[in-house]
Amino acid sequence: MERPWGAADGLSRWPHGLGLLLLLQLLPPSTLSQDRLDAPPPPAAPLPRWSGPIGVSWGLRAAAAGGAFPRGGRWRRSAPGEDEECGRVRDFVAKLANNTHQHVFDDLRGSVSLSWVGDSTGVILVLTTFHVPLVIMTFGQSKLYRSEDYGKNFKDITDLINNTFIRTEFGMAIGPENSGKVVLTAEVSGGSRGGRIFRSSDFAKNFVQTDLPFHPLTQMMYSPQNSDYLLALSTENGLWVSKNFGGKWEEIHKAVCLAKWGSDNTIFFTTYANGSCKADLGALELWRTSDLGKSFKTIGVKIYSFGLGGRFLFASVMADKDTTRRIHVSTDQGDTWSMAQLPSVGQEQFYSILAANDDMVFMHVDEPGDTGFGTIFTSDDRGIVYSKSLDRHLYTTTGGETDFTNVTSLRGVYITSVLSEDNSIQTMITFDQGGRWTHLRKPENSECDATAKNKNECSLHIHASYSISQKLNVPMAPLSEPNAVGIVIAHGSVGDAISVMVPDVYISDDGGYSWTKMLEGPHYYTILDSGGIIVAIEHSSRPINVIKFSTDEGQCWQTYTFTRDPIYFTGLASEPGARSMNISIWGFTESFLTSQWVSYTIDFKDILERNCEEKDYTIWLAHSTDPEDYEDGCILGYKEQFLRLRKSSVCQNGRDYVVTKQPSICLCSLEDFLCDFGYYRPENDSKCVEQPELKGHDLEFCLYGREEHLTTNGYRKIPGDKCQGGVNPVREVKDLKKKCTSNFLSPEKQNSKSNSVPIILAIVGLMLVTVVAGVLIVKKYVCGGRFLVHRYSVLQQHAEANGVDGVDALDTASHTNKSGYHDDSDEDLLE
């Protein structure tokens, strides 16, 4: 079973450029296929995906009465009697009415997929699909629509794809950046020799039909460096490459399980030798080509899975003598490997890369057994030495759900959930990239719920992916945007743990340090104009016709009735990046026998009439908790002052808005250091103390083929930390001048064959002469002759006894490959 990428979805990647994909389901499962395609997140700044109700029942329902159109209202989220300040957005009803655009789609289709083509182009593609599985065959029909004004108007361009049925499981493959490229994968008859695609390189103004020499298994993968280069896997496990945007294809290798683009148009892939990907799992070979298939190099064997994150290449490798796996890391595209200092995992465990950038890696290591939790480790800047960051991290094995979230609106901030000893779920937050985790502060305008033992002391707990997977009344995951500094919006409950009661919506304007209840009950929400506007729609099973918006980061709210005839709401869509002023509301209307898709696009440009000026911004110190402290705001070695829009200013940031910040370096303190391997921080203490089980044990590890010895008093600098001077704990890595090998078997060693008998005899003679000296050296430097692997295994046993357990969950299938070969719920999630 393929497990999705962790909610870290945090420092993750989206090689296909901008494109938010919505799949809106209309008919029940008995009538329609339930295919759903979720677009993967973009690099380093994951964008939220709409997650709305699916399988809406078909039948006769009375629409709620609409009132006069249009109309509006306002209220303040704080105490009663303060509503006067909310009247500053004047004449907003008339302004929005003049900028509300309705489009009725003249056909009934089972699902709708929506994607943006390019950044700030205004081009949107909408694919409607009607899919009915019959006894002998499947009947399907598609329509394609295009808008070039952010969804205000649509044109039917189905004729450009020859009225062909498009396979929704492959989605719309959008090219990176502003390449304007689009690839649609068509359905073909069962007896066809290959698949069919439709290609556009002019933002979907025109399409070219191309018949493929293979049947695709995955969505076409664009090279991040050159959008003309495409990669695809076939249903027969062939690896195909196109150098001219899909015009011609060449099979460069057979028996391929997984393939990924690396940097500089490099391709990494795993291949099998004994029949199938599943049969050879754990015995796969990892190959690399840097010239699009002209030449190859085997860079790893005994591979279980591999993945890419930041500048790191990861491989989950089977051990020599048992069925355990270990993570190996390379920073030179597989030329040399080092074993990560992480616990090995067994067949029922997994590793998962939660987040990775060029500085560090967050790695989840699964606990043995189906516990549903594991341990988060954070790496050094080489991805080799890891420190324990968080125990009992929630990561289910059944559905692969984790709440790990990168708060992109403030550096160093991550939110996730832990499974406590009493099996309740609690939210934790870190502001220093995993150095220390704490509970979220209780919102000032909220009371503790029934889960709280002390009604005066409790915390805010955030609903994320796990709550959504459990079908709680949570329509959206937490939302933050890099250009809306400090803003975080999320559903939550206030108590001792996450509650199953109906959640409310909370907002933080300082990156998660403090929170305020923003809206009663569950809502859909989105950010426009870099935080200048927040839009929300109530989550309801009844038809709706009202939206809410705020121009002061959720303090005051206005309501606007966008239609007199309520619609069954299915999705709220805005252009990725939060720079747009447009929002699209998707839904359908129902009568006795008919139903129609409808969209309403609202442009807020006239609400924010003027451009923001210097006076509209104020200086804000990020991570500020104690203004009296000289080091206030120091996180990861430096402070940052931002120019932020005043809440009282009603003006446009604009599409060209750039976040203005001023960094300043801080003196080093213990807060700038993680606990080294074998050390931990007691609760509410900044000092690292040695784990009792590891006292007296040396740490030696194999780095780039040489054995090294680590001397430490318990601290290592957080990767990316920029502090200077101040505290400087001793940490030394000493080269033992000894060659070493890890359990990652060198392919050259396995495959090498000698043709020269004299050379062999000479080498043997030399070895006999030097063997005594070698034994003496080993005894002198390796404590009585214990080899590195044994030495590490001893530390491993102590670490596991102390609860430092690991998993190898490297993602072995891309998010677009929902029909991959893996059905193992314990596969490694390396991306």
Swiss-Prot record:
Residues 50-61 are annotated as: Intrachain binding of the propeptide and the extracellular domain. This is Sortilin. Induction: During osteoblast differentiation. It holds the Pfam family Sortilin_C. Expressed in brain and prostate (at protein level). Expressed at high levels in brain, spinal cord, heart, skeletal muscle, thyroid, placenta and testis. Expressed at lower levels in lymphoid organs, kidney, colon and liver. Its main location: Golgi. The gene is SORT1. Functions as a sorting receptor in the Golgi compartment and as a clearance receptor on the cell surface. Required for protein transport from the Golgi apparatus to the lysosomes by a pathway that is independent of the mannose-6-phosphate receptor (M6PR). Lysosomal proteins bind specifically to the receptor in the Golgi apparatus and the resulting receptor-ligand complex is transported to an acidic prelysosomal compartment where the low pH mediates the dissociation of the complex. Residues 779-831 are cytoplasmic. The lineage of its organism: Eukaryota, Metazoa, Chordata, Craniata, Vertebrata. The modification Phosphoserine is found at residues 814, 819, 825. It comes from Homo sapiens. Interacts with LPL and SLC2A4. Interacts with the cytosolic adapter proteins GGA1 and GGA2. Interacts with numerous ligands including the receptor-associated protein LRPAP1/RAP, GM2A and NTS. Forms a complex with NGFR which binds specifically to the precursor forms of NGFB (proNGFB) and BDNF (proBDNF). Interacts with the Trk receptors NTRK1, NTRK2 and NTRK3; may regulate their anterograde axonal transport and signaling. Interacts with CLN5. Interacts with PSAP.
